[in-house]
Amino acid sequence: MNEAFDCVVIGAGPGGYVAAITAAQAGLKTALIEKREAGGTCLNRGCIPSKALLAGAEVVTQIRHADQFGIHVEGFSINYPAMVQRKDSVVRSIRDGLNGLIRSNKITVFSGRGSLISSTEVKILGENPSVIKAHSIILATGSEPRAFPGIPFSAESPRILCSTGVLNLKEIPQKMAIIGGGVIGCEFASLFHTLGSEVSVIEASSQILALNNPDISKTMFDKFTRQGLRFVLEASVSNIEDIGDRVRLTINGNVEEYDYVLVSIGRRLNTENIGLDKAGVICDERGVIPTDATMRTNVPNIYAIGDITGKWQLAHVASHQGIIAARNIAGHKEEIDYSAVPSVIFTFPEVASVGLSPTAAQQQKIPVKVTKFPFRAIGKAVAMGEADGFAAIISHETTQQILGAYVIGPHASSLISEITLAVRNELTLPCIYETIHAHPTLAEVWAESALLAVDTPLHMPPAKK
Protein backbone atom coordinates (compact mmCIF):
# COMPACT_ATOMS: atom_id res chain seq x y z
CA MET A 1 0.00 0.00 0.00
CA ASN A 2 1.35 3.45 -0.96
CA GLU A 3 2.33 5.72 1.93
CA ALA A 4 0.03 8.72 2.40
CA PHE A 5 1.00 12.26 3.41
CA ASP A 6 -0.91 15.39 4.33
CA CYS A 7 1.44 17.51 2.21
CA VAL A 8 3.85 16.50 -0.55
CA VAL A 9 6.30 19.10 -1.86
CA ILE A 10 8.02 18.52 -5.21
CA GLY A 11 11.31 20.42 -5.26
CA ALA A 12 13.57 21.33 -2.33
CA GLY A 13 14.72 24.77 -3.43
CA PRO A 14 14.19 27.93 -1.36
CA GLY A 15 10.44 27.69 -1.97
CA GLY A 16 10.04 23.95 -1.52
CA TYR A 17 12.08 23.35 1.61
CA VAL A 18 10.53 26.38 3.35
CA ALA A 19 7.06 25.12 2.41
CA ALA A 20 7.90 21.67 3.76
CA ILE A 21 9.25 23.02 7.06
CA THR A 22 6.22 25.30 7.47
CA ALA A 23 3.84 22.42 6.78
CA ALA A 24 5.66 20.14 9.21
CA GLN A 25 5.65 22.82 11.91
CA ALA A 26 1.88 23.07 11.47
CA GLY A 27 1.59 19.38 12.35
CA LEU A 28 1.16 18.02 8.82
CA LYS A 29 2.75 14.74 7.79
CA THR A 30 5.07 16.07 5.10
CA ALA A 31 7.15 14.61 2.28
CA LEU A 32 9.80 16.45 0.27
CA ILE A 33 10.92 15.18 -3.15
CA GLU A 34 14.21 16.39 -4.67
CA LYS A 35 16.16 15.00 -7.63
CA ARG A 36 19.42 16.79 -6.73
CA GLU A 37 20.54 18.57 -3.55
CA ALA A 38 18.46 20.33 -0.94
CA GLY A 39 18.54 24.08 -1.41
CA GLY A 40 17.97 24.02 -5.16
CA THR A 41 19.55 26.46 -7.57
CA CYS A 42 19.87 29.27 -5.02
CA LEU A 43 22.03 27.40 -2.53
CA ASN A 44 23.92 25.09 -4.86
CA ARG A 45 24.20 26.81 -8.24
CA GLY A 46 23.13 30.43 -7.79
CA CYS A 47 22.72 32.94 -4.96
CA ILE A 48 25.07 31.51 -2.35
CA PRO A 49 28.05 30.32 -4.43
CA SER A 50 28.06 33.52 -6.49
CA LYS A 51 28.00 35.63 -3.33
CA ALA A 52 30.87 33.60 -1.89
CA LEU A 53 32.94 34.48 -4.97
CA LEU A 54 31.80 38.10 -4.82
CA ALA A 55 32.97 38.24 -1.20
CA GLY A 56 36.43 37.29 -2.42
CA ALA A 57 36.29 39.94 -5.13
CA GLU A 58 35.36 42.50 -2.49
CA VAL A 59 38.52 41.63 -0.57
CA VAL A 60 40.50 42.17 -3.78
CA THR A 61 38.93 45.62 -4.13
CA GLN A 62 39.80 46.48 -0.53
CA ILE A 63 43.42 45.45 -1.05
CA ARG A 64 43.67 47.55 -4.22
CA HIS A 65 42.43 50.60 -2.33
CA ALA A 66 44.36 49.90 0.88
CA ASP A 67 46.78 52.78 0.23
CA GLN A 68 43.90 55.21 0.78
CA PHE A 69 43.75 53.98 4.39
CA GLY A 70 47.50 54.18 4.98
CA ILE A 71 48.00 50.46 4.44
CA HIS A 72 50.51 49.34 1.82
CA VAL A 73 50.16 45.84 0.39
CA GLU A 74 52.89 44.52 -1.88
CA GLY A 75 52.64 41.75 -4.42
CA PHE A 76 49.31 40.18 -3.55
CA SER A 77 47.96 37.53 -5.90
CA ILE A 78 44.61 35.89 -6.52
CA ASN A 79 44.47 32.12 -6.05
CA TYR A 80 41.25 31.50 -7.94
CA PRO A 81 41.11 27.71 -7.37
CA ALA A 82 41.28 28.47 -3.63
CA MET A 83 38.41 30.95 -4.02
CA VAL A 84 36.38 28.23 -5.74
CA GLN A 85 37.30 25.76 -3.00
CA ARG A 86 36.08 28.21 -0.36
CA LYS A 87 32.88 28.74 -2.34
CA ASP A 88 32.25 24.98 -2.39
CA SER A 89 32.95 24.76 1.34
CA VAL A 90 30.43 27.54 2.06
CA VAL A 91 27.77 25.74 0.02
CA ARG A 92 28.47 22.40 1.72
CA SER A 93 28.27 23.93 5.18
CA ILE A 94 24.92 25.62 4.54
CA ARG A 95 23.53 22.53 2.80
CA ASP A 96 24.54 20.32 5.73
CA GLY A 97 22.73 22.69 8.07
CA LEU A 98 19.66 22.65 5.83
CA ASN A 99 19.58 18.85 5.73
CA GLY A 100 19.74 18.87 9.51
CA LEU A 101 16.77 21.26 9.67
CA ILE A 102 14.75 19.02 7.37
CA ARG A 103 15.53 15.97 9.51
CA SER A 104 14.76 17.77 12.77
CA ASN A 105 11.32 18.72 11.44
CA LYS A 106 10.64 15.02 10.75
CA ILE A 107 10.09 15.55 7.04
CA THR A 108 10.27 12.41 4.91
CA VAL A 109 12.70 12.99 2.03
CA PHE A 110 12.51 11.12 -1.27
CA SER A 111 15.45 11.30 -3.67
CA GLY A 112 14.32 11.37 -7.28
CA ARG A 113 12.17 13.24 -9.76
CA GLY A 114 8.58 13.79 -8.71
CA SER A 115 5.78 13.58 -11.27
CA LEU A 116 2.01 13.78 -10.80
CA ILE A 117 0.00 10.74 -11.84
CA SER A 118 -3.26 12.16 -10.49
CA SER A 119 -4.35 15.05 -8.30
CA THR A 120 -3.61 12.95 -5.20
CA GLU A 121 -0.71 10.71 -6.28
CA VAL A 122 2.94 11.41 -7.01
CA LYS A 123 5.35 9.05 -8.74
CA ILE A 124 9.00 9.28 -7.69
CA LEU A 125 11.48 8.30 -10.40
CA GLY A 126 14.98 7.43 -9.22
CA GLU A 127 17.03 4.60 -7.75
CA ASN A 128 14.04 3.46 -5.69
CA PRO A 129 10.91 4.26 -7.73
CA SER A 130 7.74 4.57 -5.70
CA VAL A 131 4.28 6.14 -5.59
CA ILE A 132 2.98 8.15 -2.65
CA LYS A 133 -0.44 9.58 -1.89
CA ALA A 134 -1.03 13.21 -1.01
CA HIS A 135 -3.93 15.12 0.47
CA SER A 136 -2.29 18.34 -0.82
CA ILE A 137 0.62 18.93 -3.20
CA ILE A 138 2.96 21.89 -3.61
CA LEU A 139 4.81 22.19 -6.93
CA ALA A 140 8.18 23.92 -6.48
CA THR A 141 10.16 22.70 -9.48
CA GLY A 142 11.98 25.95 -10.27
CA SER A 143 13.79 26.82 -13.49
CA GLU A 144 17.00 26.21 -15.46
CA PRO A 145 19.27 28.56 -17.45
CA ARG A 146 18.00 29.18 -20.97
CA ALA A 147 20.44 28.12 -23.68
CA PHE A 148 21.33 30.18 -26.73
CA PRO A 149 19.16 28.97 -29.64
CA GLY A 150 20.78 25.94 -31.25
CA ILE A 151 23.70 25.87 -28.78
CA PRO A 152 22.89 23.60 -25.82
CA PHE A 153 25.13 23.70 -22.76
CA SER A 154 27.22 20.52 -22.90
CA ALA A 155 30.56 18.96 -22.07
CA GLU A 156 31.37 19.19 -25.79
CA SER A 157 31.44 23.00 -25.50
CA PRO A 158 33.14 23.66 -22.14
CA ARG A 159 33.86 27.29 -23.00
CA ILE A 160 30.20 28.17 -23.59
CA LEU A 161 28.80 28.55 -20.09
CA CYS A 162 25.53 29.05 -18.26
CA SER A 163 25.27 30.55 -14.77
CA THR A 164 25.89 27.08 -13.33
CA GLY A 165 28.97 26.31 -15.38
CA VAL A 166 30.61 29.67 -14.79
CA LEU A 167 30.62 28.98 -11.05
CA ASN A 168 32.79 25.93 -11.67
CA LEU A 169 35.53 27.63 -13.68
CA LYS A 170 39.01 26.83 -12.38
CA GLU A 171 40.65 29.92 -13.84
CA ILE A 172 39.98 33.61 -14.28
CA PRO A 173 39.29 34.24 -17.97
CA GLN A 174 41.60 36.74 -19.64
CA LYS A 175 38.85 37.76 -22.03
CA MET A 176 35.19 37.00 -21.40
CA ALA A 177 31.92 37.79 -23.16
CA ILE A 178 28.60 37.80 -21.36
CA ILE A 179 25.49 37.57 -23.53
CA GLY A 180 22.74 39.32 -21.61
CA GLY A 181 22.93 42.52 -19.59
CA GLY A 182 20.33 41.64 -17.00
CA VAL A 183 20.87 41.08 -13.29
CA ILE A 184 22.79 37.80 -13.54
CA GLY A 185 24.88 38.99 -16.47
CA CYS A 186 25.86 42.22 -14.71
CA GLU A 187 26.68 40.42 -11.46
CA PHE A 188 29.12 38.08 -13.20
CA ALA A 189 30.50 40.95 -15.28
CA SER A 190 31.24 42.87 -12.08
CA LEU A 191 32.78 39.79 -10.45
CA PHE A 192 35.18 38.83 -13.23
CA HIS A 193 36.09 42.41 -14.11
CA THR A 194 37.10 42.94 -10.47
CA LEU A 195 39.22 39.78 -10.62
CA GLY A 196 41.04 41.09 -13.69
CA SER A 197 39.14 39.79 -16.71
CA GLU A 198 38.55 41.89 -19.79
CA VAL A 199 34.75 41.68 -19.93
CA SER A 200 32.34 42.55 -22.74
CA VAL A 201 28.59 42.54 -22.06
CA ILE A 202 26.48 41.89 -25.16
CA GLU A 203 22.90 43.13 -24.77
CA ALA A 204 20.06 43.03 -27.31
CA SER A 205 18.20 46.05 -25.93
CA SER A 206 19.31 49.67 -25.73
CA GLN A 207 20.10 49.52 -22.00
CA ILE A 208 21.37 47.15 -19.34
CA LEU A 209 19.21 46.07 -16.41
CA ALA A 210 16.25 46.90 -18.63
CA LEU A 211 13.61 45.59 -16.22
CA ASN A 212 14.63 48.09 -13.54
CA ASN A 213 13.92 51.79 -13.58
CA PRO A 214 15.79 53.94 -16.13
CA ASP A 215 17.70 55.83 -13.43
CA ILE A 216 19.23 52.59 -12.17
CA SER A 217 20.01 51.45 -15.72
CA LYS A 218 21.75 54.69 -16.69
CA THR A 219 23.57 55.15 -13.39
CA MET A 220 24.94 51.61 -13.41
CA PHE A 221 25.88 51.79 -17.10
CA ASP A 222 27.89 54.94 -16.39
CA LYS A 223 29.55 53.42 -13.31
CA PHE A 224 30.42 50.16 -15.09
CA THR A 225 31.79 52.03 -18.10
CA ARG A 226 34.03 54.17 -15.88
CA GLN A 227 35.27 50.99 -14.21
CA GLY A 228 36.34 49.65 -17.61
CA LEU A 229 33.57 47.24 -18.56
CA ARG A 230 32.73 47.15 -22.27
CA PHE A 231 29.13 47.09 -23.46
CA VAL A 232 27.71 46.31 -26.89
CA LEU A 233 24.08 47.43 -26.84
CA GLU A 234 21.34 46.74 -29.39
CA ALA A 235 23.46 43.77 -30.36
CA SER A 236 22.52 40.73 -32.39
CA VAL A 237 24.53 37.55 -31.82
CA SER A 238 24.13 35.38 -34.91
CA ASN A 239 26.66 32.67 -34.14
CA ILE A 240 28.57 31.10 -31.24
CA GLU A 241 31.30 28.60 -32.04
CA ASP A 242 33.61 26.74 -29.67
CA ILE A 243 36.90 26.47 -31.56
CA GLY A 244 38.87 24.61 -28.89
CA ASP A 245 40.90 27.11 -26.91
CA ARG A 246 38.60 30.04 -27.74
CA VAL A 247 34.97 30.87 -28.49
CA ARG A 248 34.12 32.73 -31.67
CA LEU A 249 31.17 35.15 -31.57
CA THR A 250 29.51 36.93 -34.46
CA ILE A 251 28.07 40.19 -33.10
CA ASN A 252 26.26 42.54 -35.49
CA GLY A 253 28.17 40.84 -38.30
CA ASN A 254 31.57 41.29 -36.64
CA VAL A 255 33.61 38.29 -35.48
CA GLU A 256 35.20 38.43 -32.02
CA GLU A 257 37.02 35.77 -29.99
CA TYR A 258 36.94 35.15 -26.24
CA ASP A 259 38.32 32.66 -23.74
CA TYR A 260 34.83 31.98 -22.38
CA VAL A 261 31.29 33.05 -23.16
CA LEU A 262 28.59 33.20 -20.48
CA VAL A 263 25.06 32.93 -21.86
CA SER A 264 22.72 34.78 -19.50
CA ILE A 265 19.49 35.28 -21.44
CA GLY A 266 16.92 34.21 -18.89
CA ARG A 267 15.60 30.95 -17.50
CA ARG A 268 13.15 28.28 -18.67
CA LEU A 269 10.55 26.92 -16.28
CA ASN A 270 10.66 23.31 -15.10
CA THR A 271 7.03 22.45 -15.80
CA GLU A 272 7.55 19.86 -18.53
CA ASN A 273 7.31 16.17 -17.68
CA ILE A 274 5.96 16.67 -14.17
CA GLY A 275 2.52 15.26 -14.97
CA LEU A 276 0.49 18.46 -15.00
CA ASP A 277 -1.88 17.06 -17.61
CA LYS A 278 -2.52 13.90 -15.58
CA ALA A 279 -3.59 15.96 -12.58
CA GLY A 280 -5.49 18.53 -14.64
CA VAL A 281 -3.22 21.45 -13.70
CA ILE A 282 -3.28 24.28 -16.23
CA CYS A 283 -0.13 26.03 -17.47
CA ASP A 284 0.37 28.51 -20.31
CA GLU A 285 2.62 28.30 -23.38
CA ARG A 286 5.59 29.61 -21.37
CA GLY A 287 5.14 26.93 -18.72
CA VAL A 288 3.72 29.36 -16.14
CA ILE A 289 1.23 27.82 -13.71
CA PRO A 290 -1.42 30.40 -12.76
CA THR A 291 -2.28 30.61 -9.06
CA ASP A 292 -4.59 32.63 -6.86
CA ALA A 293 -3.38 34.70 -3.90
CA THR A 294 -3.19 31.57 -1.71
CA MET A 295 -0.86 29.94 -4.30
CA ARG A 296 -3.61 27.47 -5.25
CA THR A 297 -3.75 26.31 -8.89
CA ASN A 298 -6.94 25.50 -10.78
CA VAL A 299 -6.89 22.11 -9.00
CA PRO A 300 -8.05 22.89 -5.42
CA ASN A 301 -5.56 20.67 -3.56
CA ILE A 302 -2.52 21.49 -5.73
CA TYR A 303 -0.43 24.62 -5.14
CA ALA A 304 2.47 26.13 -7.09
CA ILE A 305 5.28 28.37 -5.83
CA GLY A 306 8.51 29.92 -7.06
CA ASP A 307 9.65 30.59 -10.61
CA ILE A 308 6.92 28.44 -12.16
CA THR A 309 4.24 30.91 -11.00
CA GLY A 310 5.56 33.54 -13.41
CA LYS A 311 5.93 36.20 -10.72
CA TRP A 312 9.29 37.30 -9.36
CA GLN A 313 12.19 34.93 -10.02
CA LEU A 314 13.65 35.56 -6.58
CA ALA A 315 14.47 33.06 -3.85
CA HIS A 316 12.87 35.14 -1.10
CA VAL A 317 9.63 35.40 -3.06
CA ALA A 318 9.58 31.63 -3.53
CA SER A 319 10.15 31.16 0.21
CA HIS A 320 7.30 33.50 1.10
CA GLN A 321 5.01 31.82 -1.41
CA GLY A 322 5.93 28.51 0.20
CA ILE A 323 4.92 29.79 3.63
CA ILE A 324 1.60 31.07 2.27
CA ALA A 325 0.84 27.78 0.49
CA ALA A 326 1.71 25.62 3.50
CA ARG A 327 -0.32 27.75 5.92
CA ASN A 328 -3.36 27.55 3.67
CA ILE A 329 -3.01 23.79 3.45
CA ALA A 330 -2.86 23.76 7.26
CA GLY A 331 -6.20 25.57 7.40
CA HIS A 332 -5.18 29.20 7.73
CA LYS A 333 -6.55 31.81 5.32
CA GLU A 334 -3.56 33.82 4.12
CA GLU A 335 -2.86 35.64 0.86
CA ILE A 336 0.38 36.72 -0.79
CA ASP A 337 1.15 40.44 -1.03
CA TYR A 338 3.61 41.51 -3.73
CA SER A 339 3.47 45.24 -2.92
CA ALA A 340 6.84 45.27 -1.14
CA VAL A 341 9.24 42.83 -2.79
CA PRO A 342 12.88 43.86 -2.35
CA SER A 343 15.18 43.21 -5.29
CA VAL A 344 18.98 43.32 -5.10
CA ILE A 345 21.73 43.40 -7.71
CA PHE A 346 25.01 42.21 -6.19
CA THR A 347 27.47 44.24 -8.23
CA PHE A 348 30.14 46.77 -7.31
CA PRO A 349 28.41 48.93 -6.14
CA GLU A 350 25.32 47.09 -4.93
CA VAL A 351 21.85 48.09 -6.12
CA ALA A 352 18.54 47.49 -4.34
CA SER A 353 14.96 48.56 -4.90
CA VAL A 354 11.47 47.97 -3.55
CA GLY A 355 7.92 49.03 -4.35
CA LEU A 356 6.94 51.41 -7.13
CA SER A 357 9.58 52.87 -9.41
CA PRO A 358 9.12 56.44 -10.66
CA THR A 359 8.26 55.04 -14.10
CA ALA A 360 5.60 52.70 -12.69
CA ALA A 361 4.10 55.55 -10.68
CA GLN A 362 3.92 57.69 -13.80
CA GLN A 363 2.27 54.88 -15.76
CA GLN A 364 -0.31 54.48 -12.99
CA LYS A 365 -0.82 58.27 -12.88
CA ILE A 366 0.17 58.43 -9.21
CA PRO A 367 1.58 61.85 -8.24
CA VAL A 368 4.94 61.19 -6.59
CA LYS A 369 8.01 63.01 -5.36
CA VAL A 370 11.41 61.38 -5.88
CA THR A 371 14.18 62.52 -3.53
CA LYS A 372 17.77 61.32 -3.87
CA PHE A 373 20.27 61.83 -1.08
CA PRO A 374 23.98 61.21 -1.82
CA PHE A 375 26.21 58.98 0.29
CA ARG A 376 28.95 61.62 0.05
CA ALA A 377 26.97 63.56 2.69
CA ILE A 378 26.80 60.55 5.04
CA GLY A 379 29.71 60.48 7.50
CA LYS A 380 29.95 56.69 7.79
CA ALA A 381 30.13 56.27 4.00
CA VAL A 382 32.92 58.84 3.75
CA ALA A 383 34.81 57.16 6.62
CA MET A 384 34.48 53.80 4.84
CA GLY A 385 35.78 55.27 1.60
CA GLU A 386 32.54 54.29 -0.14
CA ALA A 387 30.80 57.61 -0.63
CA ASP A 388 29.72 57.02 -4.22
CA GLY A 389 26.00 56.50 -4.81
CA PHE A 390 22.69 57.62 -3.39
CA ALA A 391 19.41 56.53 -1.81
CA ALA A 392 16.10 57.59 -3.33
CA ILE A 393 12.61 57.55 -1.82
CA ILE A 394 9.45 57.65 -3.93
CA SER A 395 6.63 59.18 -1.89
CA HIS A 396 3.07 60.27 -2.66
CA GLU A 397 2.97 64.01 -3.34
CA THR A 398 0.03 64.74 -1.06
CA THR A 399 -0.24 61.93 1.51
CA GLN A 400 3.56 61.50 1.95
CA GLN A 401 3.07 57.71 1.92
CA ILE A 402 6.28 55.90 0.99
CA LEU A 403 5.54 53.96 -2.20
CA GLY A 404 9.01 52.76 -3.12
CA ALA A 405 12.74 53.31 -2.95
CA TYR A 406 16.01 52.43 -4.60
CA VAL A 407 19.60 52.68 -3.48
CA ILE A 408 22.94 52.41 -5.25
CA GLY A 409 25.94 52.23 -2.97
CA PRO A 410 27.55 50.46 -0.01
CA HIS A 411 25.51 47.68 1.61
CA ALA A 412 22.43 48.49 -0.48
CA SER A 413 21.31 44.88 -0.04
CA SER A 414 20.93 45.40 3.72
CA LEU A 415 19.75 49.00 3.63
CA ILE A 416 16.67 48.21 1.53
CA SER A 417 15.02 46.30 4.41
CA GLU A 418 14.07 49.48 6.30
CA ILE A 419 12.12 50.85 3.37
CA THR A 420 10.65 47.45 2.54
CA LEU A 421 9.06 47.53 5.99
CA ALA A 422 7.83 51.07 5.33
CA VAL A 423 6.26 50.19 1.96
CA ARG A 424 4.69 46.99 3.30
CA ASN A 425 3.04 48.85 6.18
CA GLU A 426 2.07 51.97 4.20
CA LEU A 427 4.22 54.24 6.36
CA THR A 428 4.72 57.92 5.62
CA LEU A 429 7.83 60.10 5.45
CA PRO A 430 7.59 61.25 9.11
CA CYS A 431 7.75 57.60 10.21
CA ILE A 432 11.28 57.55 8.80
CA TYR A 433 12.66 60.99 9.67
CA GLU A 434 11.11 61.03 13.15
CA THR A 435 12.79 57.72 13.96
CA ILE A 436 16.20 58.13 15.61
CA HIS A 437 18.83 56.52 13.39
CA ALA A 438 22.13 55.53 15.00
CA HIS A 439 25.12 57.68 14.09
CA PRO A 440 27.37 57.16 12.29
CA THR A 441 25.60 54.59 10.11
CA LEU A 442 24.74 54.20 6.46
CA ALA A 443 21.04 53.94 7.38
CA GLU A 444 21.02 57.67 8.11
CA VAL A 445 20.72 58.10 4.36
CA TRP A 446 17.02 57.16 4.60
CA ALA A 447 16.29 59.77 7.26
CA GLU A 448 18.05 62.38 5.13
CA SER A 449 16.21 61.34 1.97
CA ALA A 450 12.89 61.54 3.83
CA LEU A 451 13.79 64.99 5.18
CA LEU A 452 14.76 66.08 1.69
CA ALA A 453 11.25 65.15 0.54
CA VAL A 454 9.85 67.80 2.89
CA ASP A 455 12.62 70.26 1.98
CA THR A 456 14.42 70.13 5.34
CA PRO A 457 17.57 68.04 4.80
CA LEU A 458 20.13 68.42 7.57
CA HIS A 459 23.31 67.67 5.65
CA MET A 460 22.61 69.31 2.32
CA PRO A 461 22.53 73.02 1.48
CA PRO A 462 19.01 74.42 1.21
CA ALA A 463 17.53 74.61 -2.25
CA LYS A 464 17.87 77.98 -3.96
CA LYS A 465 14.59 79.85 -4.08
From Swiss-Prot:
Residue numbers annotated as active site: H439 (proton acceptor)
Cofactor note: Binds 1 FAD per subunit.
Known cofactor(s): FAD
GO molecular function: dihydrolipoyl dehydrogenase (NADH) activity; flavin adenine dinucleotide binding
Pfam family membership, one: Pyr_redox_dim
GO cellular component, one term: cytoplasm
Reactions catalysed, as given in the entry: N(6)-[(R)-dihydrolipoyl]-L-lysyl-[protein] + NAD(+) = N(6)-[(R)-lipoyl]-L-lysyl-[protein] + NADH + H(+)
Cited InterPro entries: Class-I_Pyr_Nuc-Dis_Oxidored, FAD/NAD-bd_sf, FAD/NAD-binding_dom, FAD/NAD-linked_Rdtase_dimer_sf, Lipoamide_DH, Pyr_nuc-diS_OxRdtase, Pyr_nucl-diS_OxRdtase_dimer, Pyr_OxRdtase_I_AS
Binding site for FAD: E34, K35, R36, E37, A38, G39, G40, T41, C42, K51, G114, D307, A315
Flavoprotein found in the keyword field: yes
Family that this chain belongs to: Belongs to the class-I pyridine nucleotide-disulfide oxidoreductase family.
Record's protein name: Dihydrolipoyl dehydrogenase
UniProt source species: Chlamydia trachomatis serovar D (strain ATCC VR-885 / DSM 19411 / UW-3/Cx)
